From Swiss-Prot:
InterPro entries linked to this entry: DotM-like (IPR049921), DotM_C (IPR056464)
Gene, per the UniProt record: dotM
Alphabetized Pfam families for the sequence: DotM_C
Organism: Legionella pneumophila subsp. pneumophila (strain Philadelphia 1 / ATCC 33152 / DSM 7513)
BP terms from Gene Ontology: protein transport
Note on domains (UniProt): Exhibits patches of positively charged residues, which form binding sites for acidic Glu-rich peptides.
Subcellular location: Cell inner membrane
Protein name, per record: Type 4 apparatus protein DotM
Length: 380
């Protein structure tokens, strides 16, 4: 049984090997019958195409031989034209058509050569030259085009990265011994530090900044960004983009033109949407954070669109950068916690509500293990 099945499979395999041959034979037979049955229609169609080609060429050549070929194709009965005669007429017209076709192909080759991506993009860029070119397409990067941030210390200067919770606690001397040191500590044993809650409350309260007293009392950068957010809240993207574009360009010159925001501010500061936001917050930072949040109902408003703000007003930058995050940076944990509390209550609060910021800092510090030597450096 197994031998018979194997023989059948071999036989079917050999039969399949002849399939291309049979397909070619079938195509020839089909072509023959099509020519035999539809001979006059094929000749008529081919002659029609060649007549139009010949007429087009003869408009420029005015050649009598070509005119004769046109007359011949128009007067011949398709039923009397055989295959050889049709090919002869097509070749005669083709002798004239080859030249315009060659010209067209040369033009297309030239176009294809110039549109080739590999040949078009032959200039090599490094990061400096690329950002220098792209700053006109992306004006938001203008403030950092001349900066060499890669070679700078990420923990120093106006462009320094945000402090981690432990770095923040060390900077403001908020750490204290939380675990009692053992009389005979085990070598390599790790412990955790605690937070001076009173000092932490003072630091986070100071982060809140000034009370809200109207847009005219805001800093120039807060005033300008408020106008941007108001414009987006009222679906005026052109005005918002214009303010940001002007600020990007003028910041590079060292003199940011914040006055560009004044017309937009006057137009929208008394609108119902803006006044509804302002009425629910007591601090400048919390008001502007809610303006940004409301502006995002019109679409994306990333903090990367106002990079110039970071070296100008670091606290406002990080406050706006944290809008939309679940967890803020320690540098703005106080105003962020207060902002969340005001949003939850639906009204303004002059009393700092920063307990959640203190609790979050404690949790973050507890996650960092310290060696006994590091613990000894801390005060109780």
């Amino acid at each position: 049984m197994y031998i018979e099945m194997a023989q059948q499979q071999q036989q079917s395999g050999s039969d399949n090997s002849m399939a291309p041959v049979w397909i070619v034979i079938l195509l020839f037979i089909t072509a023959y019958f099509v020519w035999a049955l539809a001979h006059q229609y094929i000749v008529s169609f081919v002659f029609t195409i060649n007549i139009w080609q010949a007429r087009l060429v003869n408009l420029f050549l005015n050649n009598q031989l070509l005119a004769n070929q046109i007359y011949l194709m128009q007067t011949l009965d398709p039923n009397t034209v055989n295959w050889d005669q049709m090919v002869t007429v097509m070749r005669a017209v083709g002798d004239y058509m080859r030249y315009p076709v060659i010209c067209i192909l040369v033009v297309l080759a030239f176009v294809l050569y110039n549109s080739n991506v590999t040949l078009k993009y032959r200039k090599t860029y490094d990061m400096k030259s690329l950002r220098a070119q792209e700053q006109f397409n992306w004006p938001a990067i203008m403030p950092i085009v001349k900066e060499d941030l890669v070679s700078q210390d990420v923990n120093k200067g106006p462009w320094a990265m945000a402090l981690t919770p432990m770095e923040f606690a060390r900077k403001y001397n908020l750490l204290r011994k939380d675990d009692a040191l053992l009389d005979n500590p085990v070598p390599g044993e790790e412990m955790t530090a605690g937070i001076r809650r009173g000092d932490a409350k003072r630091v986070f309260t100071m982060q809140l900044g000034p009370y809200w007293d109207g847009f005219e009392r805001c800093s120039p950068q807060a005033y300008a960004l408020s106008a941007v957010f108001m414009a987006r809240m009222n679906r005026d993207r052109d005005a918002a983009n214009n303010i940001l574009k002007v600020l990007d360009k003028t910041f590079v010159d060292g003199k940011p033109d914040f006055s560009v925001a004044r017309p937009v501010m006057k137009k929208y500061q008394n609108s119902e949407l803006v006044q509804e936001v302002v009425a629910k917050h007591a601090y400048v930072l919390t008001v502007i954070a809610s303006l940004l949040e409301a502006a995002r109902e019109d679409g994306v408003v990333p903090s990367s669109e106002f990079l110039w703000l970071k070296p100008v007003d670091r606290r406002l930058w990080y406050m706006l950068n944290c809008v939309g995050r679940q967890t803020p940076y320690s540098e703005v944990a106080g105003p962020f916690a207060h902002w969340k509390a005001e949003k939850e209550m639906g009204r303004r609060s002059l009393v700092p509500m920063i307990d959640e910021a203190i609790r979050a800092l404690e949790i973050a510090v507890k996650e960092v293990r310290l060696t006994p030597r590091q613990m000894e450096e801390l005060e109780p």
